[in-house]
Structure formats: C-alpha cells, structure tokens
Amino acid sequence: MHLKKGKRSIGTVWRLLWKRLYSVHYKTNTYSTRSRKKLVTNFTRVNGLLLSCNGDTFPYMRTLWRYFNAPGNLMFVTTNIITFTGIVAYNTMVTVSNERVFEEQMIAAQMSLAKQKEELETRALDFPANHEQIKEADDANCEQPAIERSGEDRSVKQQNEQLDSPIRHYSLTDLVLNKEARVADYDSQRVKASLFHMLYAYMLYRDTIQPNSDSPNHNSEEWRHEVELLTRDKWLQGAHQRIDVFYDLWNNQLDKIVTSPEKVQNFHLPNWSKYPTLLKFICTELHNNELTTLDEFKQFYGKVRSNEVKKLLGLWLYDHSFLFPRNIYDNKNQEVFYDTLISDSMQDNKIFQKYSSIVMNPDNERTQLFFPNIYAQPVNKPIPSISLETYTRLLRGYITLQETNCKYDYNDNIFKLISILKMNCFLQHDKKIRTGASVRILLPRDEDRSPVLNTIPQAEKKTCYQILSKNRDILALLKRISDIQIDSS
C-alpha cells in the first residue's frame, strides 16, 4: 500500500487499514435526505488478518470477538490480568523476603553462639583455682556408691559371709521350667536374659535403699525377706539412688556374666508369682514378646508406665542396640521410636546426650538402626537422613539445656546443629503421600560428606530455605538462641 501525499484523505486511510487488519468488506451508500446526506456502511464479509477464521469452522469465534470487542468487557479482562500480575509479584517479593530473613536469623544465631562462647571462656579465667577440684571431688563422691568401697577388713567380710545369704537358692521343685522348649533365636534370648536380670536387680536395689517405695505391703513375704537380708549389710549405707549410677555398675560388672553363651542358652524366666506387681508385669511382657526386632522392643517399651524403668530401658537400648537387626531403607517406624526416646529423656541430661550423639556424630553405627537411608550414587551406598521434626526436637532440647543448666555449655552442640541444617538439607518427594516435597537432613560420614553434598543443586537448596523460612518452629528456636545471648549479656 503506497500513499501519495495529498491524494488520500484520513477517512480513506482508516478504511484501508481496517480492511487490511480485519478484512471486513463494506460498501458505503449515500442517501439523500432533506437536510443532509447520510452515509450507510454495509458489512458483507470477514476475511482479514485478525479475523481470518471462518464462522463455520469456529462457530464461537464471532461471539468471543464481540465479547472482547465491547469496551466494558475489555476493561474487566485487562483489570483482572493486571491484578493477577500484581498478586504474583507480591507473593514473589514476600517469599524472597522470608528467605532472606531466615538466612539472617541463622547467621545471627551463629554469631550469638560464637560471642557467648568467647564470654564463657573469658569468664572461666575468673574462677578460683580450687573450684574445679572441689567440683570433681563432689562428682566423684556422688557417683561412687558405697558398694564399690573395698576398705573393709577381712574379718568383717568373713562375718558377713557367715550370715544368711541375701540371694535365695532355688531348687528344681521351686522352678517351673519347660525343658522341651529350645532357643529359637540367640539374640532374642540374650535380650530377655539381660533385661530380666537388670530389672530384677534394680527392683531389689531400689527396695533396699528405699524400703518405703512401691507399697511394700503388696509384696510377698519371700520378696520382703530378701530385701531385709540385703538391708542388714553395712556396705549399703550411703548407696546412691541415681538410675544411671546403678546401670553403669550393673552393665560393667554383671551384664557379661548373666549373658554368657551358656547361661543364655539355658535361660528361662522363673516363676514370677511372688514378685512385686511391676516386676510381674515386666516378666509377663518378656514372656509374651519375642523381642527379635526393634519394633517388638518398641511395643515392650510403650507398655511400661514407670519412668524409672523407661530410663533403664533407654540406657540399656543404647548399649545393646547391636542385638537388633538393621532395616536399611524402611526405618520410618524406628525414627518415630527415636523421637519418643528423645522426648522421654528431656529431663535426663545423660540419656538425652547419648541419643542426640547419634545425630551429632554420623560415624555412630546406630544411625543405621533408627533412621531411613537415601541411596547416594556418588558414593554408591545408603546415607541415613532425619526428618525436620526430629531435628527440631533435638535443637529444642539443647536450647532448653542451655537455658536451664548452667553447669555445662551447649553452644557447640547448638552451633553444629545449625550448620547441619544449613549444609545438609535436601528435598524428598514421597510418591505414596501426595503432599509435595518435604525437607530432610542427610547425615553422611566425614569421608562421604563432600561427594554427597555437592550433588544437591543450588535451586533445591533455595527451595529448602523457602520452606524453612515458613516453619514457625524453626524460626521460634532461632529467636530463642538469639535471646540467650541477650540475656547472658
């Protein structure tokens, strides 16, 4: 289309453009009236660049064009598009802001821990020189019960041996033994033998140093007689009631004796009808439970209601976890049991640190027992991982210890947990549960750390940070870490 200057009017140019774009052929007729001439345009066909579609091929195209061609509808659609674009832009800005705030809080928490550690090291120089010696002497006196004292004279020992033995000697007529039964699984029998002897010894130990506990009137005469024989000895004076002290003594001195191969093979539960109520219940559960897997031990642990017995079982399981087989990949139930052990040990510093060391020290073999594994191609072997809920529970426990316990400093543990979250997080997509990706934390060994963590893309890390920035529990714990520094200063 070539236009020569002065040859075509504006109306002519407009009609040519309209015809080129929309190809609406029209014919203008002039009708004369009395007052003026009137132009009437008749549209005859539609065959242009924008409306090149035939009405028969797309029957709704003409209706759709009329809808969008209306000024009100066009304004409505444009407003919706602009609004949607604004919402998307706002959400993007909020997400980026939350991610930046989360990273700043992690950095602030780490700086707070480092500053508090420097203050504690500086403050430690002001303590008197004999303070540590006094504290070590008190701890030694506290944790060394009178049972370990070997300063008795030989004459006193001989007199004690002449007294009635506190251990009852059973005859074959007193025991109900099933001679036809054979050992089905050596590890299972060893678990039962070890647990029975430990809990039996603890019940006697507890009733001896604290005779008024557990309603002694409900105990049988035989049990009370054994307790009375033990209370006669002078070496029981000053015996400590701490469960961890008893367990350490029993584990170091008696466990290997009662779990020797010969004793394990011939082990049978005795007639427990004369035992206290709690010990009767324990013997019944040991008899009914095979205790061949960690799930079965979890069932046994869950039925116990005594907090003291649960503490003993927790200490025992940590040292005897090798008796249970490992399930390499499907360990979700075991991780739930680990969370239960952590929750039950919040009030016991020693047990809590034992089980938290499984996560803090990836070389700990117990990670293969409690946590599910992720197969890592760079190292060609499974790598254990923990859930965000398990991590949150551990971090909360150490923060609580730091806030309430002034005897020890847990800043290093908290700092290490924050570093683990920052470096080892990744996304896991569960095909069975359609709830999107979840954040988990890898626990690679030191030799596998670099090849495994380098395979996590930066985009995946960024997505993890976005999810963590919306987690209220994590943000609240990071704020508590910063508040510890403020309160200490």
From Swiss-Prot:
Disulfide bridges in this chain: none
Keywords in alphabetical order, please: Activator, Membrane, Mitochondrion, Mitochondrion inner membrane, Translation regulation
Keyword Membrane part of the UniProt annotation: yes
Q: A biological process (GO) annotation for this entry?
A: regulation of translation
Subcellular compartments: Mitochondrion inner membrane
Q: Which GO terms describe its cellular component?
A: mitochondrial inner membrane
Q: Does the keyword Membrane apply?
A: yes
Purpose: Required for the expression of the mitochondrial gene for cytochrome c oxidase subunit III (COX3).
Q: What is this protein called?
A: COX3 mRNA-specific translational activator PET494
> Origin organism of this chain?
Saccharomyces bayanus (Yeast)
User: What taxonomic classification does the UniProt entry list for its organism?
Assistant: Eukaryota, Fungi, Dikarya, Ascomycota, Saccharomycotina
